[in-house]
């Protein structure tokens, strides 16, 4: 977490698998890929294709832009001056949430350890992320998490969580690859694409509230 906290820029790819109940009983798995670029303290880009609508989020320190390229919708709102505050705003206004938020805030260790009840060392693994990892497990009042942390670079390679209040004990897993810390980021990386400028504007709001009414 010290490496993450001290990096002015960072990028990674996140591959998320989330279980969802099925009518037959056993859960189904839905997957999403995220391409994440961060420039602290006030720039963020998240591009997300997956088993559902593709989404893109851009934050430049002044505004948040959410773009749905397939539906051709774009939502824009004024935003506060830090990544953490902008992500809080995105959740409060539009229920936009990402499973890797704790990794990109200013103090990842504080975010990950908040409310910690128990933690223990499981052992080593050589099968995750193509590197040797330390495997740890920890729990708070909300979730039980197993984490694979690079033994040499101290970067998270896999996180696996079960939420304590979930009666079905569904599993949520994220593999994290392509880590790049401290590398230059192109000046226009945090600006929406040209297609977003031509998209249909909608309110930056919860999905059902923001979607335009269909023509009869």
Region spans (language model):
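N-terminal mature ectodomain segment of secretory-pathway/periplasmic proteins
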Residues: 2-73, 140, 145
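Gly/Pro-enriched, hydrophobic low-complexity segments
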Residues: 15, 50, 56, 65-66, ...
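Flexible, processing/modification-adjacent segments and terminal tails
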Residues: 2, 6, 63-132, 138, ...
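Residue-identity detector for threonine
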Residues: 9, 31-32, 37, 55, ...
